[in-house]
C-alpha cells in the first residue's frame, strides 16, 4: 500500500519538501486495508491449510470465493441457500416489500417482473437511509423511459418479451452482490396495482464467518437538457471509502453541432480529503471501450445495448461499463463527472462503500475562489512572472493593457478547483479540449484567528507558482504525474491571501486534465482556521455544501 511519495519542490521562501499523506489518517487507512483484504488472506490461508481454528477451539473449513460480477467482493463458500418469493401487486400505500432477510448473508440474484413505473429501494443493516433508491428501469440500464431492450452484462440482464402491449413483461435479473450483516429489506414503490413479482436468491452465513464490509449503493442522475458544451454532467458525488463497480449512461442528442459522443470524456477526482489524485478519459466512446463512435455490441464488462443512428450529427445511445477486472478504489471521496454538451443525459453509478471506515480528516479546504485568465505562455520566463492584479475583490473583468480577462467566481468541491470546464477551446463546436500552454490565476482568502503555522497542500499535474500574503512561497513542477506538495507558511491574524498561478501545458501525460486541489493541514484545533472569507458582522455559520 502506498502511503506517500517524496515531492520535488523548488523551494523559495517558506516552501519545504516533505512526505505527503495525512498522518492522522494513517492508522485508519491501515485498519481499513486489513479489513478490506482479510477475505483474500483467509482464502490464501484456507487454500494452504484447508482448515482454520474456530472460536470454540474446533476446526472448521473456511474458504472464500471472489464474486464473478464484482471480484472485489469475497464471500464464504459455506452457506445455506434461500429464496424469497413475491407474487403481489403494489397496494394503496404505494410500496411493498418483496424481500425481508435476516443476516449475515448476501443477495446473489434477484428476478423481477415489475410494473412500468416502479422504483427500487434497498436498505441493509437498518441504515437510516436506503443505500439504493433508484427508478427501476434506469437501474437496469433502460434509460429515458424507452421500451426495454435486451441487456446482457456482468451486473444484470434484461429479457424483453416479444409480445407487444404487455406492461411489465421484461424479466429483470440482478447479479450485483448485496452483502448484509443484520438485515436486508428490498422494496418496490409505484402506483397502486403495479406488479411486484420477484424471486430473491440469497445465501446465509454462520455468525462466526468474516463478512465483507462493503455495501452496495447506487446514484441516479437525470438532466433534460444537460448544461451546454464545455460544462460537465455529474454522475456521482460520493463520500466515504470504497470502490466504483460500474456506470450506465444514456444520451438523447439535442445539440447537433457535433457527434453526441464528443463531450470531452469522463473525469474522476478522487480522495480530496486524504490523497488527491485524478483519472481522466478522452471521449464517451473511448471511455466505454469503443472507437470512432458506437456499435450495437455487448460484452460482460462494456457494451452498447441500444443505439439509434440517424446520421453523424444525430445519434442516441445507451452505454455501460463495469469495472470488475479494474475497480476504481477511493479512500475518502469520489467526484465522478463526464463532459456535457446540452443533450438529455441519464446515468446510474454503482459503487460499494466500506462500513468499517471512519472517514476522519483534519484538513480544511478554501471554499470560495476568484479565477482569472487566460495568459499565453510564449517563453518559459512567462511561467513565474506575476501579472499585476487588484488587491481587493476582483471586478468582473481584469484588464492587462487593453486586453480583457474574465473573472470566474468558483466554489471548490471537496477541495477541487476544476478548470477544464472553464478554459477550453471555444472557437469550434467539436470536442471541448482543454486549453494548453496557458496560465490562470486563482485567489482565495483564508481567515485565521491567530498567528500560526499552516501546511498548504497543493495537488496538480503540471506547474504552479504560489504566493502567500504577497510573497512567493514556492514553485512546483509536476509535469510527469499528478502529485501533491506541502508548503509551510505562517498566517497572520485575520485575512490571509493565497494566490496560485496554475499552468497547463502539453507536457503531462494527462494534458486534457486541468484541475488543482488545495487544502490546509492543521496540527491544532480546526476552529482556528476558516477557508471562507469572513465578511464584516458575519458570525460563525455551518459550512455549506459545495455545489456545481
Predicted segments, located by residue:
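Bacterial N-terminal signal peptides that target proteins for export
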Residues: 27-39
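C-terminal segment of classical bacterial N-terminal signal peptides
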Residues: 45-54
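Beta-strand-centric surfaces of beta-sandwich/beta-rich domains
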Residues: 58-362
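Short strand-edge motifs at loop-to-beta-strand transitions and within beta-strands
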Residues: 174, 320, 442-444, 483-487
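Accessory carbohydrate-binding/adhesion or oligomerization-edge regions at the termini
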Residues: 357-428, 497-548
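Aromatic-lined ligand-binding clefts that engage carbohydrates, nucleic acids, or primary amines
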Residues: 448, 452-467, 498
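Solvent-exposed beta-strand/loop surfaces of large extracellular or lumenal domains
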Residues: 467-487
